[in-house]
UniProtKB/Swiss-Prot annotation:
Source organism superkingdom: Bacteria
InterPro entries the UniProt entry points to: QueA, QueA_dom1, QueA_dom2, QueA_sf
Natural source organism: Janthinobacterium sp. (strain Marseille) (Minibacterium massiliensis)
Enzyme Commission code(s) on record: 2.4.99.17
Protein known as: S-adenosylmethionine:tRNA ribosyltransferase-isomerase
Gene Ontology CC terms: cytoplasm
Gene Ontology MF term list: S-adenosylmethionine:tRNA ribosyltransferase-isomerase activity
Family: Belongs to the QueA family.
Quaternary structure annotation from Swiss-Prot or TrEMBL: Monomer.
Role of this protein: Transfers and isomerizes the ribose moiety from AdoMet to the 7-aminomethyl group of 7-deazaguanine (preQ1-tRNA) to give epoxyqueuosine (oQ-tRNA).
Catalytic function, reaction form: 7-aminomethyl-7-carbaguanosine(34) in tRNA + S-adenosyl-L-methionine = epoxyqueuosine(34) in tRNA + adenine + L-methionine + 2 H(+)
Keyword Plastid: no
Keyword Cytoplasm: yes
Length: 341
């Protein structure tokens, strides 16, 4: 039985990537097998996949979800939209010296007022005066992860989105997908690798460390996903033909496994709190492309469950010694599912 301290590691600060590389597919790729680590360029992913394999991407689009504002009492606030509920309402985190009262107005971006509603846990309901997506796009700022030290600029607005981002709703990018450019997608298709898409709106909880030493006590954050019947059909056809189901990122993995709890993948939409730790039996995904994750994070636990705890520990030690770039703008790994015990 693993505990929180088993997922801690020391990372030199200079290995946290602060900016993306000039070319998406120029990142490094660590091919990981038990007791075998191979350093590759990310474009080599074409050679690691076979005709008939299926790549499953998350097509969520990152919202410009960060706002700075002023309460009607004059106090400064920072707002991070966590989830769009409907056309006029959102759930959001609010940072302020004093918690805002229900009914209070907050002026955001010196452009429009929102009204504070009820609080549930760490989130407030906020009512927007007009279409949420239009106001966010016009006045919000891209919410870069907390370990990136610069404010988002126009370059980030392009590079912190995947080239196939389509469905707005995330507050963090599905970062494994950032390595794919159109030329690489075309090369994969030309080889006979199939492409499919799910949507999972990544929440701010993805950056939160687990705080309970006993992992069973962790309250997993919730994220919304949807999987189409078309994607389900592609997955099942690939499985029948003996191809690999390759999740592009932990968010695609989480959606696919959440929708497979009955034993086989089902189409539909739902909120998921699936917390994958070592001992979990994977039902759909056989390969995983993923970036390097934060210490004590749920994502580090997920990849340890998938490829094996000792294998991941060795991979991270190798990556640090070889000066791989870590986290959202960093390099990637190609993982194979550990055989069930």
């Amino acid at each position: 039985m693993y505990s929180l301290s088993d997922f801690d590691f020391e990372l030199p600060q200079e290995l946290i990537a602060q900016t993306p590389l000039a070319e998406r597919s120029a990142s490094r790729l660590l091919q990981v097998l038990p007791e075998q680590m191979t350093d590759r360029n990310f474009a080599y992913i074409v050679d690691l996949l076979s005709p008939g394999d299926l790549l499953v991407f998350n097509d969520t689009r990152v919202l410009k979800a960060r706002f700075f504002g002023i309460k009607e009492t004059g106090g400064k606030v920072e707002v991070l939209v966590e989830r769009v509920i409907d056309q006029r309402n959102v759930h959001a985190q609010i940072r302020a010296s004093k918690s805002p009262a229900v009914g209070m107005r907050i002026r955001l971006a010196d452009a429009f007022d929102v009204i504070v509603g009820e609080r549930a846990g760490e989130f407030y309901e906020l009512q927007f005066p007009d279409d949420v997506f239009e106001l966010i796009e016009a006045h919000g700022r891209l919410p870069l992860p907390p370990y990136i030290e610069h404010a988002a600029d126009a370059y980030d607005e392009t590079r912190y989105q995947t080239v196939y981002a389509k469905t707005p709703g995330a507050v963090a990018a599905p970062t494994a997908g950032l390595h794919f450019d159109q030329a690489l997608l075309d090369a994969l298709t030309a080889k006979g690798v199939k492409l499919a898409y799910i949507t999972l709106h990544v929440g701010a909880g993805t950056f939160q460390p687990v705080r309970n030493e006993n992992l069973a006590e962790h309250n997993m954050h919730s994220e919304w996903y949807t999987i189409s019947q078309q994607t389900v059909d592609l997955v099942k056809a690939t499985q029948v033909a003996g191809g690999n189901i390759v999740a592009v990122g932990t968010t695609s993995m989480r959606a696919l496994e959440s929708a497979s709890q009955s034993g086989s993948l089902q189409a539909g939409s739902a909120d998921t709190r699936l917390f994958i730790t070592p001992g979990y039996t994977f039902k759909t995904v056989t390969r995983l492309i993923t970036n390097f994750h934060l210490p004590k994070s749920t994502l580090l636990m997920l990849v340890s469950a998938f490829a094996g705890y000792d294998t991941i520990r060795a991979a991270y030690q190798h990556a640090i010694s070889q000066r791989y770039r870590f986290f959202s703008y960093g390099d990637a790994m190609f993982l194979t599912r550990m055989p069930p015990c």
